[in-house]
Amino acid sequence: MRYLLCTLMAIFFFAPVTYADNGIISIKSSHDVKTTVDRLENILREKGMTVFIRINHAEGAQKVGKKLRPTELIIFGNPKVGTPLMQCGQSVGIDLPQKALIWQDEAGQVWLSYNDPKYLASRHSIKECVEIIKKIEKVLGNFARVATMP
C-alpha cells in the first residue's frame, strides 16, 4: 500500500506537464491517441461527466484528401460545475463545455491538452469564484493524469 501511495505521488508531482503562454496545459501521454482518448472518455463517464462528442480530426482531414497526424477532440462537461462558473462570469460560456485535444506531434509524442482554468478566469475577468477555479483545475488535472499515465 505504501509503495502504491509513493508511486501515485511521484506520478502526480513529476508528470510531464507543459504550460504554454496561450493558456493551454499539455501533458505527455504514455499511450497512442486512440487509447488516451478512450481512457479519458472512460474516466469522464465514471465520474459523472457528460461526454457530448468525440471528434476525430484526422478522419475529417482524410475525407477531404488531406493528411493529419492522429488528432481527436473530446467535448465534455457537467452543469453542476459549469453553471456556477458562468454565474461568476457569463461570457465563460463561450469556452464551455470543457474540451480536451489529444494529438500526436511531429516526433510521434502524444499529448493531452486542455484550457488552463486560471487562463479562462483571466480571459473572462472572473476575479471571484477562486474555489470553483481551483476545483476545476484539480479535476481536469486528475482526469488528464489518469488518461495519460502508464
Q: What does each model-found stretch correspond to?
A:
Residues 1-4:
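Positively charged n-region of N-terminal signal peptides that target proteins for export
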Residues 6-15:
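Bacterial N-terminal signal peptides
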Residues 19-50, 145:
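Terminal, regulation- and interaction-focused segments at domain boundaries
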Residues 26-28, 73-75, 101, 111-113:
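Soluble periplasmic/extracytoplasmic beta-strand elements of cell-envelope proteins
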Residues 36, 40, 57, 132, ...:
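Stable alpha-helical elements in mature extracytoplasmic
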Residues 45, 56-98, 102:
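Compact, glycine-rich, soluble single-domain proteins
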Residues 99-126:
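Beta-strand/loop substructures that line and gate deep hydrophobic ligand-binding cavities in soluble
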Residues 118-150:
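C-terminal partner/receptor-binding element of secreted or periplasmic proteins
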